[in-house]
Amino acid sequence: MSASPAGSVWDSDELAPPGSAVWDLLVIGGGTAGIVAAKTAAGFGASVLLVERDRTGGDCLWTGCVPSKALLTAAHAAADARAASRYGVDVAGVEVDFTRVMTYVRQAITTVQPTDSPAALREAGVHVAQGVARLTGPRTAQVGTDLVGFAQALLATGAAPAVPPIPGLADASPWTSETIWSLPARPTRLLVLGGGSIGCELGQAFARLGSAVTMVEAEPRLLSREDADAAALVTAALIADGVTVRAGAAVTAITSGLMGWCAELADGGEVVFDEVLVAVGRSPRTTELGLDRAGVTVNERGFVQVNSRLQTANPRIWAAGDLTGHPQFTHTAGVHASLAAGNAVLGLRRTVDVATIPRVTFTQPEVAAVGVSAEHAGPQSGLTVRTTQHTEVDRAIAEGAVAGFSRLILDGKGRVVGATIVGPRAGESLPEVVLAARHGLRARNLAAATHAYPTYGDGVWKASIDHVQHQLHQPGVHRVTSALRTVRRRWLAR
């Protein structure tokens, strides 16, 4: 679906390192983690060979972040046009041309692709080769028919969509987040298996583009890892878009009949569909790496085991990105890859910070979060929850988008340990909270920073101010402020 289709061939560099018997760093995998690690190490002056079996750019460019957000942009535009009458703007006959939508998606990929191309890597000083790399020992790997030696190696092969062994599912030719971009036409009836971020995003997108969508999630609710109130708002939005949500349901079998394909549910229900999208999680791509020969271990789920410095059981081999089992986001892969590259080629001892990795679900409304959620703030937790509903945020009122909130989770000293923001462009309001959580800032620090008005950032600001005001009414603080007022009155009465 792009200018560089899967399976394309591109020129490879020599596998022999210049002026040495071994490469300073061998990078296996050319997605976000591999690209960032390779460029970082080359920037430090190391000799770097990156080996990619298919296309550089990885899932984010070709089948993940870029195409999905382009598709969502088109879908949200259709929804906004249909809803324009609420603002006094009538848009008659909103029609979706799915072929043109997919052309727009391809254009987005084509625009971003040069940044992640082999040419861009070479310009950064990285040697690039196309092929399958397999570890053959603690410091050697086979690339095609050649043996390559390395002083350090970094594994960055990512993860792939998992397809559950549901009887009959394979017969229905299921789509995944990797393959859905090859759809020849808009599905009339789409079944989405999985109610996580990917399922919710793509389910809403196809519903807004005109498909009849049914989402089936085994957990009791969608977005089970997020704040329950946030999940409820997204669920309500999906239902308003015409999506049928079946939470707490499991598909036991797929059969075919006169009406099309049919998903049989454990509760006795059925869902008839034409196409099925599987979005139930991802599995690491490690089967072809030869990990056992290099002394690299994996956990019970198959993810490469790393320490806090992203070092594997082989101290000369590092790993970054989705195959480590850390939160599977492009930004995580990039930050961790840079860290691992510095540790590998410079001997640094930097450690990862998993607690403050931001996450965003790009539905309408968006859900942006970091750290712990309100569900962790039980009576014995010592945590405090401060929430501003967007009915109190003037920008949300002006835009008619008050179905949302900004929520801070604070420890006993008022330090930010988590946050959830729901609303338009919620992810854009999150960075200041991530910074606060990472550096131990307190609600009073956020309250003291002037926020532009009117913005959705007002939600976080008001939540932090709310906490400060609560603190001012604590008995100890109240005694201090009363004493200061008394002193001030006496001074003014002189």
What are the residue ranges of the model-derived segments?
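Flexible, glycine-rich terminal cap/loop adjacent to redox cofactors
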Residues: 28-33, 39-54, 59, 66, ...
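Glycine-rich dinucleotide-binding loop and its adjacent helix/turn
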Residues: 5-12, 65, 157-212, 216, ...
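Glycine-rich flavin
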Residues: 2-23, 39-46, 51-186, 219-223, ...
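Short hydrophobic core segments
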Residues: 26-28, 133, 148-158, 192-193, ...
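Glycine-centered short loops/turns at secondary-structure junctions
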Residues: 45, 210-212, 242, 440
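Beta1/beta-strand and adjacent pyrophosphate-binding region of the FAD-binding site
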Residues: 16-33, 186-196
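A conserved FAD-binding loop/helix module that cradles the flavin
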Residues: 226-233, 320-376, 453-476
